[in-house]
Amino acid sequence: MQQPPSNAAGAGQIPSGQQHLWMMMQQQQQQQQMQLSAAPLGQHQYGIGSQNPGSASDVKSLWIGDLQQWMDENYIMSVFAQSGEATSAKVIRNKLTGQSEGYGFIEFVSHSVAERVLQTYNGAPMPSTEQTFRLNWAQAGAGEKRFQTEGPDHTIFVGDLAPEVTDYMLSDTFKNVYGSVKGAKVVLDRTTGRSKGYGFVRFADENEQMRAMTEMNGQYCSTRPMRIGPAANKNALPMQPAMYQNTQGANAGDNDPNNTTIFVGGLDANVTDDELKSIFGQFGELLHVKIPPGKRCGFVQYANKASAEHALSVLNGTQLGGQSIRLSWGRSPNKQSDQAQWNGGGYYGYPPQPQGGYGYAAQPPTQDPNAYYGGYTGYGNYQQQRQ
Protein backbone atom coordinates (compact mmCIF):
# COMPACT_ATOMS: atom_id res chain seq x y z
CA MET A 1 0.00 0.00 0.00
CA GLN A 2 1.33 3.39 -0.96
CA GLN A 3 2.40 5.43 2.05
CA PRO A 4 2.40 9.23 2.16
CA PRO A 5 5.63 11.17 2.37
CA SER A 6 7.25 11.45 5.78
CA ASN A 7 6.90 15.19 5.52
CA ALA A 8 5.06 17.60 3.29
CA ALA A 9 8.05 19.60 2.16
CA GLY A 10 8.08 20.35 -1.51
CA ALA A 11 4.37 19.80 -1.91
CA GLY A 12 2.65 21.69 -4.67
CA GLN A 13 1.24 25.00 -3.60
CA ILE A 14 -2.21 26.37 -4.22
CA PRO A 15 -2.91 30.07 -4.31
CA SER A 16 -4.30 31.57 -1.12
CA GLY A 17 -7.10 34.03 -0.59
CA GLN A 18 -10.86 34.01 -0.53
CA GLN A 19 -11.10 34.79 -4.24
CA HIS A 20 -9.30 31.58 -5.16
CA LEU A 21 -11.41 29.54 -2.73
CA TRP A 22 -14.55 30.93 -4.23
CA MET A 23 -13.39 30.13 -7.76
CA MET A 24 -12.71 26.56 -6.71
CA MET A 25 -16.15 26.33 -5.13
CA GLN A 26 -17.68 27.49 -8.37
CA GLN A 27 -15.90 24.63 -10.09
CA GLN A 28 -17.30 22.21 -7.54
CA GLN A 29 -20.83 23.38 -8.10
CA GLN A 30 -20.53 22.96 -11.87
CA GLN A 31 -20.48 19.18 -11.57
CA GLN A 32 -23.57 18.44 -9.48
CA GLN A 33 -23.22 14.70 -9.24
CA MET A 34 -24.45 14.11 -5.76
CA GLN A 35 -23.65 10.69 -4.33
CA LEU A 36 -25.94 9.80 -1.48
CA SER A 37 -24.34 6.41 -1.50
CA ALA A 38 -21.12 4.96 -2.82
CA ALA A 39 -22.55 1.57 -3.82
CA PRO A 40 -24.53 0.49 -6.92
CA LEU A 41 -28.24 1.12 -7.10
CA GLY A 42 -28.93 -2.54 -6.57
CA GLN A 43 -27.82 -2.40 -3.00
CA HIS A 44 -30.77 -0.23 -2.06
CA GLN A 45 -33.22 -2.75 -3.45
CA TYR A 46 -32.07 -5.63 -1.35
CA GLY A 47 -32.26 -6.19 2.36
CA ILE A 48 -30.97 -9.36 4.01
CA GLY A 49 -33.70 -11.12 5.90
CA SER A 50 -36.56 -8.89 6.96
CA GLN A 51 -34.40 -5.95 7.89
CA ASN A 52 -36.14 -2.64 7.32
CA PRO A 53 -34.15 -0.18 9.40
CA GLY A 54 -35.93 2.86 10.68
CA SER A 55 -32.75 4.88 11.14
CA ALA A 56 -29.10 4.83 10.18
CA SER A 57 -28.13 3.41 13.57
CA ASP A 58 -30.31 0.34 12.89
CA VAL A 59 -28.46 -0.66 9.73
CA LYS A 60 -26.30 -3.72 10.29
CA SER A 61 -25.65 -4.89 6.72
CA LEU A 62 -22.70 -4.05 4.50
CA TRP A 63 -22.45 -3.98 0.71
CA ILE A 64 -19.43 -5.82 -0.73
CA GLY A 65 -18.26 -5.20 -4.29
CA ASP A 66 -15.69 -6.37 -6.84
CA LEU A 67 -16.67 -10.01 -6.27
CA GLN A 68 -15.23 -12.53 -8.71
CA GLN A 69 -17.46 -15.25 -10.16
CA TRP A 70 -16.13 -17.93 -7.82
CA MET A 71 -16.77 -15.86 -4.70
CA ASP A 72 -20.00 -17.28 -3.28
CA GLU A 73 -21.79 -16.96 0.05
CA ASN A 74 -19.59 -19.60 1.67
CA TYR A 75 -16.46 -17.71 0.74
CA ILE A 76 -17.85 -14.44 2.08
CA MET A 77 -18.90 -16.05 5.36
CA SER A 78 -15.49 -17.69 5.74
CA VAL A 79 -13.73 -14.38 5.15
CA PHE A 80 -15.61 -12.73 7.99
CA ALA A 81 -15.68 -15.80 10.23
CA GLN A 82 -12.93 -14.45 12.44
CA SER A 83 -15.15 -11.56 13.43
CA GLY A 84 -17.52 -14.18 14.82
CA GLU A 85 -20.51 -11.93 14.36
CA ALA A 86 -21.55 -12.25 10.70
CA THR A 87 -25.02 -13.80 10.54
CA SER A 88 -25.66 -14.16 6.79
CA ALA A 89 -24.36 -13.35 3.33
CA LYS A 90 -25.94 -12.95 -0.09
CA VAL A 91 -24.37 -12.68 -3.55
CA ILE A 92 -26.62 -10.92 -6.07
CA ARG A 93 -26.98 -12.97 -9.25
CA ASN A 94 -28.40 -12.36 -12.70
CA LYS A 95 -31.91 -13.81 -12.83
CA LEU A 96 -31.41 -15.20 -16.32
CA THR A 97 -27.85 -16.52 -16.24
CA GLY A 98 -27.38 -17.18 -12.55
CA GLN A 99 -23.98 -15.49 -12.76
CA SER A 100 -22.79 -13.20 -10.00
CA GLU A 101 -23.40 -9.51 -10.60
CA GLY A 102 -20.15 -8.77 -8.76
CA TYR A 103 -21.58 -7.60 -5.46
CA GLY A 104 -23.48 -8.81 -2.44
CA PHE A 105 -24.35 -8.17 1.19
CA ILE A 106 -23.24 -9.29 4.63
CA GLU A 107 -25.37 -8.92 7.73
CA PHE A 108 -23.91 -8.65 11.22
CA VAL A 109 -25.39 -8.92 14.69
CA SER A 110 -25.36 -5.16 15.26
CA HIS A 111 -24.65 -1.78 13.69
CA SER A 112 -21.52 -1.32 15.81
CA VAL A 113 -20.07 -4.64 14.62
CA ALA A 114 -20.80 -3.77 10.98
CA GLU A 115 -19.15 -0.39 11.47
CA ARG A 116 -16.06 -1.99 12.99
CA VAL A 117 -15.79 -4.45 10.11
CA LEU A 118 -16.19 -1.63 7.58
CA GLN A 119 -13.38 0.36 9.17
CA THR A 120 -11.12 -2.69 9.57
CA TYR A 121 -11.58 -4.53 6.28
CA ASN A 122 -12.34 -1.87 3.68
CA GLY A 123 -9.25 -1.47 1.48
CA ALA A 124 -7.44 -4.39 3.12
CA PRO A 125 -6.30 -7.44 1.06
CA MET A 126 -8.89 -10.17 0.45
CA PRO A 127 -7.77 -13.73 1.33
CA SER A 128 -6.70 -15.94 -1.60
CA THR A 129 -6.79 -13.00 -4.02
CA GLU A 130 -4.67 -10.12 -5.25
CA GLN A 131 -7.40 -7.54 -4.67
CA THR A 132 -8.68 -5.54 -1.74
CA PHE A 133 -12.06 -5.37 -0.02
CA ARG A 134 -14.57 -2.84 -1.30
CA LEU A 135 -17.15 -2.37 1.42
CA ASN A 136 -19.85 0.16 2.13
CA TRP A 137 -23.09 0.49 4.03
CA ALA A 138 -26.02 -1.41 2.52
CA GLN A 139 -28.25 1.64 2.95
CA ALA A 140 -27.50 5.09 1.60
CA GLY A 141 -26.23 7.41 4.30
CA ALA A 142 -26.12 4.77 7.06
CA GLY A 143 -22.57 5.64 7.96
CA GLU A 144 -22.99 9.37 7.48
CA LYS A 145 -25.91 10.54 9.60
CA ARG A 146 -24.20 9.73 12.85
CA PHE A 147 -21.46 12.24 12.06
CA GLN A 148 -23.95 15.07 12.18
CA THR A 149 -24.05 14.94 15.98
CA GLU A 150 -20.31 14.61 16.53
CA GLY A 151 -19.61 18.32 16.43
CA PRO A 152 -18.08 20.40 13.65
CA ASP A 153 -15.59 18.95 11.23
CA HIS A 154 -13.57 20.39 8.39
CA THR A 155 -13.39 18.75 5.00
CA ILE A 156 -11.27 18.98 1.87
CA PHE A 157 -11.88 17.81 -1.66
CA VAL A 158 -9.31 15.38 -3.11
CA GLY A 159 -9.25 14.91 -6.88
CA ASP A 160 -7.24 12.99 -9.48
CA LEU A 161 -7.34 9.79 -7.43
CA ALA A 162 -6.12 6.54 -8.99
CA PRO A 163 -8.81 3.87 -9.61
CA GLU A 164 -7.41 1.57 -6.93
CA VAL A 165 -7.58 4.14 -4.10
CA THR A 166 -10.02 3.12 -1.36
CA ASP A 167 -11.44 4.92 1.66
CA TYR A 168 -8.81 3.25 3.80
CA MET A 169 -5.90 4.22 1.55
CA LEU A 170 -7.04 7.82 1.28
CA SER A 171 -7.58 8.14 5.01
CA ASP A 172 -4.24 6.49 5.78
CA THR A 173 -2.40 8.84 3.42
CA PHE A 174 -3.55 11.84 5.44
CA LYS A 175 -3.55 10.22 8.88
CA ASN A 176 0.17 9.60 8.68
CA VAL A 177 0.67 13.35 8.44
CA TYR A 178 -2.28 14.84 10.34
CA GLY A 179 -3.48 13.39 13.61
CA SER A 180 -6.93 14.98 13.50
CA VAL A 181 -8.14 13.10 10.40
CA LYS A 182 -11.58 11.65 11.18
CA GLY A 183 -12.15 9.68 8.00
CA ALA A 184 -12.14 9.69 4.22
CA LYS A 185 -14.58 8.85 1.46
CA VAL A 186 -13.86 7.90 -2.15
CA VAL A 187 -16.94 8.59 -4.28
CA LEU A 188 -18.02 5.61 -6.35
CA ASP A 189 -20.11 5.31 -9.48
CA ARG A 190 -23.62 4.18 -8.52
CA THR A 191 -23.89 1.72 -11.39
CA THR A 192 -20.45 0.13 -11.52
CA GLY A 193 -19.23 0.61 -7.98
CA ARG A 194 -15.93 1.93 -9.37
CA SER A 195 -14.16 5.05 -8.16
CA LYS A 196 -15.11 8.31 -9.86
CA GLY A 197 -11.61 9.61 -9.19
CA TYR A 198 -12.32 11.97 -6.31
CA GLY A 199 -13.20 11.93 -2.65
CA PHE A 200 -13.18 13.83 0.64
CA VAL A 201 -11.14 13.84 3.83
CA ARG A 202 -12.55 15.06 7.14
CA PHE A 203 -10.52 16.74 9.87
CA ALA A 204 -11.36 17.60 13.46
CA ASP A 205 -8.84 20.44 13.45
CA GLU A 206 -9.37 23.37 11.11
CA ASN A 207 -5.70 24.34 11.14
CA GLU A 208 -4.70 20.88 9.91
CA GLN A 209 -7.38 21.06 7.25
CA MET A 210 -5.95 24.35 5.98
CA ARG A 211 -2.40 23.00 6.12
CA ALA A 212 -3.39 19.88 4.20
CA MET A 213 -4.86 21.97 1.39
CA THR A 214 -1.42 23.42 0.74
CA GLU A 215 0.96 20.73 1.95
CA MET A 216 -0.72 17.71 0.37
CA ASN A 217 -1.58 19.28 -2.96
CA GLY A 218 0.53 17.40 -5.51
CA GLN A 219 1.54 14.65 -3.09
CA TYR A 220 0.98 11.04 -4.12
CA CYS A 221 -1.77 8.72 -3.01
CA SER A 222 -0.98 5.37 -4.61
CA THR A 223 0.22 6.10 -8.15
CA ARG A 224 -1.04 9.63 -8.79
CA PRO A 225 -0.47 13.11 -7.34
CA MET A 226 -3.54 14.48 -5.59
CA ARG A 227 -5.36 17.68 -6.42
CA ILE A 228 -6.62 19.33 -3.24
CA GLY A 229 -9.36 21.93 -2.91
CA PRO A 230 -12.00 23.23 -0.51
CA ALA A 231 -15.36 21.56 -0.01
CA ALA A 232 -18.41 23.84 0.13
CA ASN A 233 -20.16 23.94 3.49
CA LYS A 234 -23.86 24.57 3.87
CA ASN A 235 -23.82 24.34 7.67
CA ALA A 236 -20.55 25.85 8.83
CA LEU A 237 -21.85 29.41 9.00
CA PRO A 238 -25.25 30.74 10.09
CA MET A 239 -27.49 32.36 7.53
CA GLN A 240 -26.57 35.98 7.04
CA PRO A 241 -28.98 38.52 5.53
CA ALA A 242 -26.08 40.06 3.59
CA MET A 243 -25.84 36.89 1.53
CA TYR A 244 -29.14 37.67 -0.09
CA GLN A 245 -29.13 41.43 -0.35
CA ASN A 246 -28.56 41.28 -4.10
CA THR A 247 -31.28 38.73 -4.70
CA GLN A 248 -33.97 40.83 -3.08
CA GLY A 249 -36.48 42.40 -5.40
CA ALA A 250 -35.92 39.98 -8.25
CA ASN A 251 -39.65 39.42 -8.42
CA ALA A 252 -42.75 39.38 -6.28
CA GLY A 253 -42.06 35.90 -4.96
CA ASP A 254 -38.98 37.17 -3.20
CA ASN A 255 -41.01 39.61 -1.14
CA ASP A 256 -43.47 36.97 0.00
CA PRO A 257 -42.19 35.52 3.31
CA ASN A 258 -44.29 32.41 2.72
CA ASN A 259 -43.01 31.71 -0.78
CA THR A 260 -40.40 28.95 -0.77
CA THR A 261 -40.65 27.96 -4.44
CA ILE A 262 -37.78 28.30 -6.90
CA PHE A 263 -38.15 28.28 -10.66
CA VAL A 264 -35.36 26.32 -12.40
CA GLY A 265 -34.80 27.28 -16.03
CA GLY A 266 -32.40 26.13 -18.72
CA LEU A 267 -32.61 22.45 -17.77
CA ASP A 268 -30.96 19.80 -19.87
CA ALA A 269 -33.62 17.58 -21.45
CA ASN A 270 -32.20 14.52 -19.69
CA VAL A 271 -32.41 15.90 -16.15
CA THR A 272 -34.96 14.10 -13.97
CA ASP A 273 -37.00 14.99 -10.90
CA ASP A 274 -34.76 12.76 -8.80
CA GLU A 275 -31.65 14.62 -9.93
CA LEU A 276 -33.21 17.92 -8.90
CA LYS A 277 -34.11 16.41 -5.53
CA SER A 278 -30.55 15.21 -5.05
CA ILE A 279 -29.02 18.58 -5.87
CA PHE A 280 -31.46 20.95 -4.21
CA GLY A 281 -32.01 18.65 -1.24
CA GLN A 282 -28.59 19.54 0.14
CA PHE A 283 -29.87 22.96 1.17
CA GLY A 284 -32.87 21.88 3.22
CA GLU A 285 -36.08 19.88 3.41
CA LEU A 286 -37.98 19.68 0.13
CA LEU A 287 -41.76 19.64 -0.15
CA HIS A 288 -42.21 19.36 -3.92
CA VAL A 289 -40.02 18.91 -7.00
CA LYS A 290 -41.54 18.95 -10.49
CA ILE A 291 -40.28 19.01 -14.08
CA PRO A 292 -43.16 19.35 -16.59
CA PRO A 293 -43.02 16.63 -19.27
CA GLY A 294 -41.19 17.83 -22.35
CA LYS A 295 -40.23 21.17 -20.83
CA ARG A 296 -36.81 22.63 -20.07
CA CYS A 297 -37.79 24.00 -16.69
CA GLY A 298 -38.82 22.83 -13.25
CA PHE A 299 -39.94 23.90 -9.80
CA VAL A 300 -38.55 23.20 -6.36
CA GLN A 301 -40.39 24.02 -3.15
CA TYR A 302 -38.66 24.06 0.24
CA ALA A 303 -40.09 23.73 3.72
CA ASN A 304 -38.69 27.13 4.71
CA LYS A 305 -37.66 30.40 3.12
CA ALA A 306 -34.05 30.36 4.29
CA SER A 307 -33.36 27.07 2.52
CA ALA A 308 -34.83 28.41 -0.71
CA GLU A 309 -32.76 31.61 -0.47
CA HIS A 310 -29.61 29.62 0.18
CA ALA A 311 -30.18 27.34 -2.80
CA LEU A 312 -31.00 30.25 -5.11
CA SER A 313 -27.89 32.14 -4.04
CA VAL A 314 -25.50 29.19 -4.48
CA LEU A 315 -26.88 27.22 -7.43
CA ASN A 316 -27.88 29.96 -9.84
CA GLY A 317 -25.69 29.68 -12.94
CA THR A 318 -24.11 26.33 -12.03
CA GLN A 319 -23.85 23.39 -14.43
CA LEU A 320 -26.40 20.57 -14.45
CA GLY A 321 -26.44 17.95 -17.19
CA GLY A 322 -24.21 20.05 -19.41
CA GLN A 323 -26.34 23.19 -19.13
CA SER A 324 -26.12 26.27 -16.92
CA ILE A 325 -29.29 26.46 -14.84
CA ARG A 326 -30.92 29.80 -14.12
CA LEU A 327 -32.94 30.29 -10.97
CA SER A 328 -35.56 32.78 -9.87
CA TRP A 329 -38.49 32.83 -7.49
CA GLY A 330 -41.55 30.88 -8.52
CA ARG A 331 -45.08 31.34 -7.24
CA SER A 332 -46.09 29.81 -3.96
CA PRO A 333 -48.35 26.75 -4.45
CA ASN A 334 -50.00 27.65 -1.14
CA LYS A 335 -52.06 30.17 -3.06
CA GLN A 336 -54.99 28.59 -4.84
CA SER A 337 -54.33 30.67 -7.94
CA ASP A 338 -50.83 29.22 -8.23
CA GLN A 339 -51.70 25.53 -7.84
CA ALA A 340 -51.58 25.11 -11.62
CA GLN A 341 -47.78 25.10 -11.71
CA TRP A 342 -47.80 21.88 -9.67
CA ASN A 343 -50.93 20.34 -11.17
CA GLY A 344 -49.85 20.53 -14.80
CA GLY A 345 -51.42 23.79 -15.91
CA GLY A 346 -49.89 27.20 -15.59
CA TYR A 347 -46.24 26.44 -15.91
CA TYR A 348 -46.15 25.07 -19.42
CA GLY A 349 -46.19 28.54 -20.90
CA TYR A 350 -44.17 30.50 -18.39
CA PRO A 351 -43.52 34.07 -19.46
CA PRO A 352 -39.92 35.21 -19.99
CA GLN A 353 -40.23 38.27 -17.76
CA PRO A 354 -39.27 37.97 -14.07
CA GLN A 355 -42.51 39.58 -12.93
CA GLY A 356 -44.42 36.56 -14.19
CA GLY A 357 -42.98 34.45 -11.41
CA TYR A 358 -41.50 31.86 -13.75
CA GLY A 359 -39.05 34.01 -15.67
CA TYR A 360 -35.36 34.29 -15.04
CA ALA A 361 -34.07 36.96 -12.73
CA ALA A 362 -32.76 39.98 -14.63
CA GLN A 363 -29.33 39.53 -13.04
CA PRO A 364 -27.93 36.37 -11.44
CA PRO A 365 -27.89 36.68 -7.64
CA THR A 366 -24.54 37.86 -6.39
CA GLN A 367 -22.86 35.10 -4.43
CA ASP A 368 -20.96 35.76 -1.22
CA PRO A 369 -17.52 34.09 -1.50
CA ASN A 370 -17.11 34.06 2.27
CA ALA A 371 -20.25 32.18 3.13
CA TYR A 372 -19.70 28.62 1.97
CA TYR A 373 -16.17 27.50 2.79
CA GLY A 374 -15.65 24.43 4.93
CA GLY A 375 -17.10 20.93 4.83
CA TYR A 376 -20.47 19.24 4.91
CA THR A 377 -21.09 16.86 7.79
CA GLY A 378 -22.12 14.07 5.41
CA TYR A 379 -19.91 13.01 2.50
CA GLY A 380 -22.96 12.51 0.34
CA ASN A 381 -23.49 16.24 0.03
CA TYR A 382 -20.26 16.98 -1.79
CA GLN A 383 -19.82 17.71 -5.44
CA GLN A 384 -17.00 16.91 -7.81
CA GLN A 385 -14.70 19.66 -8.93
CA ARG A 386 -14.31 20.22 -12.64
CA GLN A 387 -11.41 18.24 -14.02
UniProtKB/Swiss-Prot annotation:
Subunit structure comment from the entry: Interacts with the poly(A) tail of mRNA in nucleus.
Induction remarks: By ozone-induced oxidative stress.
Record field: compositional bias (Polar residues): 329-342
GO molecular function: mRNA binding; poly(A) binding
Entry GO CC: nucleus
Domain annotation RRM: ranges: 60-140, 154-233, 260-332
Cellular location(s): Nucleus
Summary of the tissues where the protein is detected: Mostly expressed in seedlings, and, to a lower extent, in leaves, stems, and flowers. Present in immature anther tissues (tapetum cells) and mature pollen grains.
Gene name, Swiss-Prot/TrEMBL: RBP45A
Keyword Nucleus: yes
Family: Belongs to the polyadenylate-binding RBP45 family.
Species, as recorded: Arabidopsis thaliana
Protein name according to UniProt: Polyadenylate-binding protein RBP45A
InterPro entries linked to this entry: Nucleotide-bd_a/b_plait_sf (IPR012677), RBD_domain_sf (IPR035979), RBM42_RBP45_47-like (IPR050825), RRM_dom (IPR000504)
Keywords: mRNA processing, Nucleus, Repeat, RNA-binding
A biological-process GO annotation: mRNA processing
Lineage: Eukaryota, Viridiplantae, Streptophyta, Embryophyta, Tracheophyta
Function statement: Heterogeneous nuclear ribonucleoprotein (hnRNP)-protein binding the poly(A) tail of mRNA and probably involved in some steps of pre-mRNA maturation.
Chain spans, region Disordered: 329-387
Pfam families linked: RRM_1
